[in-house]
From Swiss-Prot:
Keyword Lipid metabolism applies: yes
Keywords associated with the record: Hydrolase, Lipid degradation, Lipid metabolism
Active site: S342, D456
Motif extent (GXGXXG): 313-318
Family to which the UniProt record says this protein belongs: Belongs to the NTE family.
Domain PNPLA: 309-469
Lineage: Bacteria, Bacillati, Actinomycetota, Actinomycetes, Mycobacteriales
Species annotation: Mycobacterium tuberculosis (strain ATCC 25618 / H37Rv)
Signal peptide start and end residues: none
Protein's name according to its UniProt entry: Uncharacterized NTE family protein Rv2565
Binding-site positions, a nucleoside 3',5'-cyclic phosphate: 24-140
GO-annotated molecular function: lysophospholipase activity
Domain of life: Bacteria
Chain ranges for the short sequence motif DGA/G as given in the UniProt record: 456-458
Length: 583
């Protein structure tokens, strides 16, 4: 819907209407309501401003006319939300106690303030008002529901910073959202908004329109198109739960509204390779190309329906990830976000590049078709291999692509040997992020990154489901490769057909028993050292897929067909058990 500027309503009418809609005042008669309306004070509360803090004297009751407010406990968590028609602070005034919590404006709001003295004087002078309020409060207690602690974004600002018209993009986003719920659009003519001289004029003119649209729709898109004016751009930023910023120039503008950095931001990239300074400036939670796939992925994020796929490390067993992805996508499962560790990072990056399953599998076959990627052995000073083959393979596969330019969400995990910290790669070179995540200590040399010395993330988090689940925009499918260890009986540096006799075995290993090669021992140690958190206890886990890869050697990349089939079978079983994964 499109709206134009509105003149504010007359104050007296507004006060009576606002008071009449308050539950605790529902039963008072018109004369009492009129008397109370003459004493109230109208106040504009800017976005992010505190109405009051915990511990302050309860000196007023506030009636929300427009906007949205949150109650914040002294510990800092939000435990309730208030919108148009709600009263704030009434119990504290009646009890004569200090504020038990703070209240902050989520967006620009208008409240009616009733001074505590005025309210208590009226209660004492009007016994009928006391009875009416007690009845209303009793009803409220009977009908009370637990406060919402988590809430999906509903007001989405769409901002054009350059020459690209926002209207076609908004239409595409709204169309994509239609399959998830009802969407309204507030996009006043730029001639109207650019002519406004005072910010309060916008608050007066559009707050009621925004409140009404929010009450009757699942989402409201508020649009600041090119030429709409700085005041309107600020108003859109202030009202929005999230912002969608259109990127149609290589570098961000010199001036970015301060509120844009205080809201979750999604970028719609209208050119192929915007400069990473956009990410420096706005720290977006996601970015999407300006095409049908990108608009669909953005809509799923807004609706909380964005599916993530997180994959574990496991050497050659990680080839099962490609079979899982093939089975899921061929069944119609749409995945927007990918993440993983070690071999899971390789698969995640391939899928985030936008490859379909067939192309990804073909690329995986090409990846392992040549010489053994771990075959460039050297004197083991920092590692058993030089790492040159791995470097060439990773660089040849992913090139100079930046994570910021991938069409789908991606992260990988490595570990910093200096600090012992988990490093989550969401920015920079895809090749660098993958190479760090697969740097098995002792087998592949670590990666220097500034003051960091990065090794395989499996040392700390072999299946980073907790990282993916921290994103609240949708559910997550986990691919877990942890299985009973079946060691091979080879000697690593020797071909499997060469089995040393007992005497030579004793000379090489000091034992008559057949032991697994060093590479397998290192990889298995990762499985044991990594977190054993119960995946089912994590929020937003939709499914756990567990391919049976126990018979696949962790370094036997020639078993790609067996690994692919194990992945397909496990994904097929998950789909049969949970058909709702297809959305």
């Amino acid at each position: 819907m499109t709206t134009a500027r509105r003149r504010p309503k007359r104050r007296g009418t507004d006060a009576r209407t606002a008071l009449r809609n308050v539950p605790i005042l529902a039963d008072i008669d018109d004369e009492q309501l009129e008397r109370l309306a003459t004493t109230v004070e109208r106040r504009h509360v800017p976005a992010n401003q505190w109405l009051f803090h915990a511990g302050e004297p309860a000196d007023s009751i506030y009636i929300v006319d427009s906007g949205r407010f949150v109650a914040v406990a002294p510990e800092g968590h939000v435990f309730a939300e208030m919108a148009s028609g709600d009263s704030i602070g009434d119990l504290g005034v009646i009890a004569g106690a200090a504020r038990s919590a703070g209240v902050r404006a989520l967006r620009d709001g208008v409240v009616w303030r009733i001074a505590a003295e005025t309210f208590t004087d009226m209660l004492e002078a009007t016994p009928l008002l006391q009875s009416a309020m007690l009845r209303a409060m009793a009803r409220m207690l009977r009908q009370s529901r637990p406060a919402k602690t988590a809430r999906r974004p509903r007001v989405i600002g769409v901002v054009s910073n350059g020459d690209t018209a926002a209207a076609p993009m908004v239409d595409a986003i709204a169309t994509s959202l239609d399959s998830h719920g009802r969407t309204a659009v507030i996009a006043p003519p730029v001639e109207t908004t650019s002519a406004v001289q005072e910010y309060d004029e916008l608050v007066e003119a559009f707050s009621e329109t925004l409140d009404r649209a929010e009450r009757s729709n699942d989402w409201v898109l508020v649009v600041a198109d090119r030429g709409a004016g700085d005041l309107w751009r600020h108003y859109v930023s202030a009202q929005s739960d999230r912002l969608v910023v259109l990127v149609d120039q290589r570098y961000p503008p010199d001036a970015v509204d301060s509120l844009a950095t205080q809201r979750p931001v999604h970028l719609i990239t209208c050119l192929a390779e915007p400069d990473p300074s956009w990410w420096d400036r706005l720290a977006p939670v996601s970015h999407h190309p300006a095409n049908s796939d990108g608009f669909g992925a953005l809509a799923r994020r807004i609706a909380g329906r964005s599916l993530g796929l997180v994959m574990a490390g496991g050497g050659a067993r990680g080839l099962a990830h490609f079979g899982v992805y093939q089975e899921l996508t061929e069944a119609g499962v749409v995945i927007d976000r990918f993440g993983g560790t070690s071999s899971g990072a390789i698969a995640s990056a391939a899928f985030a590049l936008g490859m379909d399953a067939g192309d990804a599998i073909a690329a995986a076959r090409e990846f392992i078709a040549g010489s053994d990627p771990l075959g460039d052995y050297t004197i083991p000073i920092s590692a058993l291999t030089r790492g040159g083959r791995v470097d060439r393979l990773v660089q040849g596969f992913f090139g100079n692509t930046l994570i910021e330019h991938l069409p789908r969400g991606f992260f990988s995990v490595s570990a910093d040997m200096i600090t012992g910290d988990q490093i989550i790669h969401r920015r920079g070179s895809v090749s660098g992020a993958v190479r760090a995540s697969i740097s098995i200590p002792g087998l592949i040399p670590p990666v220097h990154n500034g003051e960091q010395l990065l090794v395989d993330g499996g040392l700390l988090n072999n299946l980073p489901a907790n990282v993916m689940c921290a994103d609240t925009d949708g559910e997550v499918i986990c691919v877990d490769l942890r299985r009973t260890f079946v060691p091979s009986k080879g000697f690593g540096l020797l071909p499997p057909i060469v089995t040393p006799p007992g005497l030579l075995r004793r000379l090489l290993t000091g034992t008559d028993n057949a032991l697994p090669p060093l590479q397998e021992t290192l990889l298995r140690a990762f499985d044991l050292a990594a977190s054993t958190a119960n995946l089912r206890e994590l929020p937003r886990v939709a499914a756990i897929i567990e391919p049976d890869v126990s018979k696949i050697g962790v370094l036997n990349f020639k078993q790609i067909d067996a690994a692919l089939e194990a992945g397909r079978m496990a994904a097929r079983a998950a789909l049969q058990a949970q058909p709702d994964l297809v959305r």
